[in-house]
Amino acid sequence: NGENIAEVWMSAWSLGLEWTEGVSGYHGANDYHMGNAWELDRVIDLAHTHRLYINLVLNYHGRISTWCDPEWHLHPYNKATPGGWLTRPLEFFSDERAMEMQRRFCRYTQARWGWAPAIFGYELCSEINLTGHETHHKTHFDPAVVAWCRTLGGYLKNIDAYGHLVSAHVSNDYTFLNPALCNLAEMDFNPLDAYHHGQPERIIPLVAATADAGAAFSKPILITEFGGSPMAAGREHLLIEQHAALWAGACVPLSGVPMFWWWQV
C-alpha cells in the first residue's frame, strides 16, 4: 500500500522485554523475555523484507501511569510487585536504580537490533505526558521527566554507532508541546498526536497548525498518531479522514504525512 514507516511498541502484551515476574514469559526487572526478543527479531526481518522502517517505542504511558490505561500496578519496578522498589510512578524518572535499569535495557536493545537497517529510531516513551498519577496531561513539564529524556537520550546516542533518531512522544495535540522538552539536543524530532475528536472539518487546520507549531523548534515534527477518535469510527469515515490527512500532510512542512492509528484499515 506504499507505507514505508510504522511504530512498534515494546509493550507488556507483545514484544516487551521486562515486566512483572509471574506474567507469562517475564521474570521481573533486568531479566529479559527471550521469547519476545525472538519475536521482535522476526518483526524486524519482515520489515526489512518489505522495506518498512520501524520507529521502536521503548516505553509507553500506561506502564508508568495509575490513571490512563494503567499498568503501574504490574510494573516490575513497583515495590508492590516481586523485587520492585518504587512507590509512585513518577519515581521511574528520577530514581537512579530505575535509570540504571533503563540504561541496561537501552544497551541490550541497541546491541541486539541497532544494526538492522529497518530501525528508523528509538522513542523513549510514547504519550509521556499521560504518565504519573495526576490527570492534567502535563507530566512532561516536570523537570525530572525532561531530565530523564536528556539523560537517557544522551546515553542512547553515545552507544549507538549508527546514529538512529531519538525522540519522546506527546499525546493530545500540538498545544501540549513543552518547549523545554522539544528543544533538547538529545531529541532529534518531535512526535505527537493529532485527533480531531469528532470534528472532521478540523483535520486540515489541525495538520497545518501542527506544522506551524513545530517550526519554532528548528527540528522536524511528525504526527505519529492520527485519527478522528482514539475510540474508533466506521471504516468509511476512517478512510475519508486518512485521505484528508495524507493530502494535508504533504502540503505543509511536516517531516512526513500523519501516521494513522487504525492500521487495520
PLM regions and their residue ranges:
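Active-site mouth of glycoside hydrolases
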Residues: 1-189, 193-201
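Catalytic-core region of carbohydrate-active enzymes that cleave or remodel glycosidic bonds
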Residues: 45-52, 154-165, 181-265
